[in-house]
A protein has these predicted regions:
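Transmembrane catalytic cores of multi-pass membrane glycosyltransferases
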Residues: 227, 236-337, 344, 353-358, ...
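Signature aromatic-anchored transmembrane alpha helix within multi-pass, membrane-resident enzymes
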Residues: 270-281, 380-408
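Hydrophobic/aromatic-rich transmembrane helices and adjacent perimembrane loops
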Residues: 245-247, 357-382, 392-393
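Transmembrane alpha-helical segments
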Residues: 117-125, 204-218, 248-257, 318-325, ...
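Active-site lumenal/periplasmic loops and adjacent helix-entry segments of GT-C-fold
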Residues: 23-208, 215, 241-245, 420-421, ...
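Short hydrophobic alpha-helices at membrane interfaces in multi-pass membrane enzymes
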Residues: 213-234
């Protein structure tokens, strides 16, 4: 291993080419959606299956008007601005300045982030790995590798899962339990899962920069470096508040190993203390905002990551790390304490369920140190990457990117039944009618699938908007579904009680049954559904 390797100086042409390819891969889903969209249809920019894209699209527009800290429009309860969304504020402002839609600014920004993350990962691998084959093996494994969860996902989706009881009991039923998922099904736990996801590319980049700044401050100690590390920790926490806990877990794990090995005890203690203070300061600021908002802290918890699922996420890397751990630790200095501490911090947090509410956040960035240490163990002693080793790598890491490519290909294909991805002229007319009539405090009631395409351009509030941001979401969502399934006899009472002004009913929910509701007036009708406006005062005036 190198004692004083370069970081970004002298990056080879191949690394730049790889970064450009990664950036192009980020653009492919949107490019394909644009190509397959029929005349008259608009690509919204949401070619992902995640409902969070609706949330981000709302924030891009809302933050441009309200500022980098926004109020919560996904719930009916009054609240003061408390959600820090600086990234979406920048996206919205760039969109306003350029005239490009926020979604396309978001996608192009993601391409830049993908390129930067690729260069950062390459530079990090080069810093810790001196042998060229080890470097490229680690780099490619991090950027496009995964685990064996792709096989499980494929098996679960296949007819075999329904034809054989043993497959159902071993795979289908366990993964059908609430909040049980392999890493392949999560958005940001692998780099390859994040390549088409601008949001998680940003988080990966900020978290990795913060961890590397922490290491640099220890290695080349100065108070300026300490300050930069603290700022990096604070910045990553502002971008995604969960990362603050992950970063502190890494920092304290590195510090513990350095103390055990009697390596730079003062330096690691000083840097850890500064970074801890920075993260706590951000937590305090966000806590103050939430406390003043008038809304409770959301009760949502992330999915637990079981030890076996974590092993299946990186099986080859875990085997190599455990195989060579004793020697790797015995010969280690600061660099090895840092990488092992990084692994330990992420792993402990990942396996902290049920006590820590968001354990899946610990996986983010784990792939980098785990893969680098695994490569160092394998190539120690001049081992070669022969055809058999390459085949094993592909077998144990290749299912994830294959499944991800297939999912992205499917999700970016045209579907006239998914207006959150492709807006028809009728859909755009419905949105225009809603925006013409709506005020900022008006409440919209719509089914889950319809919120995904109505929400981004809607300036008002939602009765049941988002699983994390809506107060008492489960109850409100269930009430929405019950109302849409009902015979509409209690619709007027429900709409009045919850001060709902706009009510969208898709064709699949039979909007005709709501035409007899007193005060519920069709505002805009298409073949796909009816946008109603509830005007109880008109009913009182007619009575």
């Amino acid at each position: 291993m190198r004692t004083a390797p370069r970081f970004f100086q002298g990056l080879p042409l191949a690394a730049w080419v790889a970064a450009l390819v990664i950036a192009a891969l980020h653009m492919l889903p949107m490019a394909r959606a644009k190509l397959v969209a029929p005349d008259g249809y608009t690509v919204t920019g949401n070619v992902s299956s995640s409902p969070d894209l609706m949330q981000y699209r709302v924030w891009m527009r809302q933050a441009a008007a309200e500022g980098p800290v926004v109020s919560n429009r996904f719930t009916t309860e009054p609240n003061r601005p408390y959600l820090p969304v600086p990234f979406y504020y920048v996206i919205g402002k760039v969109s306003q300045a350029t005239g490009v839609t926020p979604e396309w600014v978001y996608v192009w920004t993601g391409a830049v982030l993908a390129m930067l993350l690729s260069l950062l990962v390459f530079a990090t691998a080069r810093y810790f790995l001196s042998e060229r084959t080890a470097l490229w093996t680690a780099f490619l494994s991090i950027m496009i590798g995964g685990g064996v969860g792709g096989y499980i996902v494929t098996l679960e989706r296949s007819s075999i899962a329904h034809d054989f009881t043993i497959v159902q009991r071993l795979f289908t039923e366990p993964l059908a339990q609430p909040m049980v998922e392999v890493l392949d099904e999560l958005r940001g736990d692998y780099v390859v899962n994040s390549l088409a996801d601008t949001h998680f590319l940003l988080i990966w980049l900020f978290a990795t920069v913060a961890i590397l700044a922490f290491y640099r401050a220890i290695r080349s100690f100065s108070w300026t470096a300490v300050g930069l590390a603290a700022v990096s920790f604070a910045g990553a926490t502002v971008v995604h508040v969960y990362e603050g806990v992950t970063l502190l877990a890494v920092a304290f794990s590195v510090a513990a190993l350095c103390w055990v090995r009697r390596i730079k005890r003062f330096e690691v203690s000083a840097v850890t203390a500064a970074c801890t203070i920075a993260v706590i300061a951000v937590f305090a600021w966000i806590g103050l905002l939430v406390g003043r908002s008038g809304l409770p802290v959301p009760p949502w918890r992330g999915p637990p990551i079981y030890p076996l699922l974590l092993f299946l996420g990186f099986p080859l890397a875990w085997v190599l790390v455990f195989w060579g751990l004793a020697r790797y630790w015995r010969e280690g200095g600061l660099e090895r304490c840092f990488l092992l501490g990084w692994i330990i911090g992420c792993t402990v947090l990942t396996l902290s369920a049920p006590f820590y509410p968001w354990p899946n956040r610990g996986v983010l960035s784990l792939q980098i140190p785990l893969t680098i240490v695994a490569a160092a163990v394998w190539f120690n002693g001049q081992r070669k990457l022969d055809a058999r080793a390459i085949a094993v790598c592909i077998l144990l890491m290749g299912s994830t990117p294959v499944v991800k490519v297939m999912d992205r290909w499917k999700s970016s294909g045209f579907s006239e039944t998914q207006p959150q991805k492709f807006l028809s002229p009728d859909d755009r007319a419905t949105i225009a009618a809603l925006n013409t009539a709506a005020r900022t405090n008006d409440v919209l009631l719509a089914d889950f699938d319809d919120r995904l395409w109505l929400a981004p351009d809607y300036r008002g509030r939602h009765y049941a908007g988002h699983f994390f941001l809506t107060v008492d979401y489960d109850r409100k969502h269930a009430e929405t579904v019950d109302l849409l399934k009902s015979d509409a006899s209690r619709a007027a009472e429900f709409l009045t009680k919850n001060q709902i002004r706009f009510f969208y009913v898709a064709k699949r929910r039979d909007p005709s049954k709501f035409r007899t509701v007193p005060g519920l007036v069709p505002l805009h009708e298409t073949a796909d559904g009816v946008l109603f406006e509830y005007l109880p005062a008109r009913t009182r005036g007619q009575s």
